[in-house]
Amino acid sequence: MSDDFEVVRPEEQAGDEKDRDLRPRSLVDFQGQTKAKENLSVFIKAARERGESLDHLFLIGPPGLGKTTLAQITANELGVDFKVTGAPALDKPKDLAGILTTLTERSVFFIDEIHRLKPAIEEMLYIAMEDYELDWIIGQGPGARTVRIPIPPFTLVGATTRAGMVSSPLISRFGIVQRFEFYSHEELASIISRSASILEIEIEKKAAIALARCSRGTPRVANRLLRRMRDFAQVAGKSSIDEMTVAAGLKQLNIDGLGLETYDRQILRSIIENYSGGPVGAETLAISIGESQDTLEDYYEPYLIQSGLLQRTPRGRMVTLKAYEHLGLNPPKLGDGQEGLFD
């Protein structure tokens, strides 16, 4: 995998812990996701006024858009404790029981990658979410018995990048469902300016906008790129980040004006050069670029589709006219077997 993809990859990676100081701690400071934020503000206020736990919250969206941050903010706004784990860490029922039995009244329990929960763990959650009780089996064999243990009312916040892999029974137990969208350039520019202020580095407005355009609609990528631009500016002896610094830095990282890196362009070129622009199946495409199908679908395709460069069709993946233009290639003429490609 290319080094430039490590910079624009939306999933959390080593070094991103430095961004924790950049994360907003209240809904007022949280940029973007306006509708979700407005709705959540109402639900939180109502729950606080009634002295009740907030309904269970389900967050859906690509990685790096702020799902974990919003879960933490939810706990902050409610004034309650916050516990966090990932679904892969809940390997056995006792792992989940150990957390549920230590929750405090109305606390927020966040499970990331909730689509990866094992069936046995998921079934334990059903009763905990609905009745605030935990079924625990004591003993083995014919003498085994089930004891129901009460737990304090709590709010489960589940986050996923793959909602289609979450079972219907689990989804139905969430009272609030919010979908995260990619951020606009304006929203990302605001996030970059705020982060630059916290990092005590000046960034020109035009430079912030240029950086926002290359951040793949993702705050995590924007903050990561900002740190890299700070490095380039510092080594160049500059006291601020200007457009020239951003342009030179992005070129050095092999990131183009749309935020595409080497593998993005390789995907588009592979479809064009090897499959006449498509359609081509995801499995075949993943093999052709030497990546797993999950990586292709989770980390590459969402932004390529959102940017209007790639289409998912019932027959497979197809590039768009915009992809040809962006790569500086001539699109096929009608009659070359691509009659429906740009319809």
Swiss-Prot record:
Q: Where in the cell is it found?
A: Cytoplasm
Q: Which UniProt keywords apply?
A: ATP-binding, Cytoplasm, DNA damage, DNA recombination, DNA repair, DNA-binding, Hydrolase, Nucleotide-binding
Q: How does it assemble?
A: Homohexamer. Forms an RuvA(8)-RuvB(12)-Holliday junction (HJ) complex. HJ DNA is sandwiched between 2 RuvA tetramers; dsDNA enters through RuvA and exits via RuvB. An RuvB hexamer assembles on each DNA strand where it exits the tetramer. Each RuvB hexamer is contacted by two RuvA subunits (via domain III) on 2 adjacent RuvB subunits; this complex drives branch migration. In the full resolvosome a probable DNA-RuvA(4)-RuvB(12)-RuvC(2) complex forms which resolves the HJ.
Annotated protein name in UniProt: Holliday junction branch migration complex subunit RuvB
- Residue ranges the record marks as coiled coil: none
Q: Which GO terms describe its molecular function?
A: ATP binding; ATP hydrolysis activity; four-way junction DNA binding; four-way junction helicase activity
Q: Where is this region: Small ATPAse domain (RuvB-S)?
A: 184-254
Catalytically driven reaction(s): ATP + H2O = ADP + phosphate + H(+)
Family membership, please give it: Belongs to the RuvB family.
* PANTHER family from the UniProt entry: HOLLIDAY JUNCTION BRANCH MIGRATION COMPLEX SUBUNIT RUVB, PTHR42848
Region Large ATPase domain (RuvB-L), annotated ranges: 1-183
Its biological purpose = The RuvA-RuvB-RuvC complex processes Holliday junction (HJ) DNA during genetic recombination and DNA repair, while the RuvA-RuvB complex plays an important role in the rescue of blocked DNA replication forks via replication fork reversal (RFR). RuvA specifically binds to HJ cruciform DNA, conferring on it an open structure. The RuvB hexamer acts as an ATP-dependent pump, pulling dsDNA into and through the RuvAB complex. RuvB forms 2 homohexamers on either side of HJ DNA bound by 1 or 2 RuvA tetramers; 4 subunits per hexamer contact DNA at a time.
Which major enzyme category is it? hydrolase
A GO cellular component entry from the record: cytoplasm
What Enzyme Commission number does this protein have? 3.6.4.-
Q: Where is this region: Head domain (RuvB-H)?
A: 257-343
Residues where Mg(2+) binds: 68
Q: Where does ATP bind?
A: 22-23, 64, 67-69, 130-132, 173, 183, 220
Source organism's superkingdom? Bacteria
**In the UniProt entry, what is the domain comment?**
Has 3 domains, the large (RuvB-L) and small ATPase (RuvB-S) domains and the C-terminal head (RuvB-H) domain. The head domain binds DNA, while the ATPase domains jointly bind ATP, ADP or are empty depending on the state of the subunit in the translocation cycle. During a single DNA translocation step the structure of each domain remains the same, but their relative positions change.
Binding-site residues for DNA, renumbered to this chain: 312, 317
Q: Give one GO biological process term.
A: DNA repair
Q: Which InterPro entries match?
A: AAA+_ATPase (IPR003593), AAA_lid_4 (IPR041445), DNA_helicase_Holl-junc_RuvB (IPR004605), P-loop_NTPase (IPR027417), RuvB-like_N (IPR008824), RuvB_C (IPR008823), WH-like_DNA-bd_sf (IPR036388), WH_DNA-bd_sf (IPR036390)
Please list where the region (Disordered) is annotated: 1-23
HAMAP family from the UniProt entry: DNA_HJ_migration_RuvB
> Main subcellular localization, coarse class?
cytoplasm
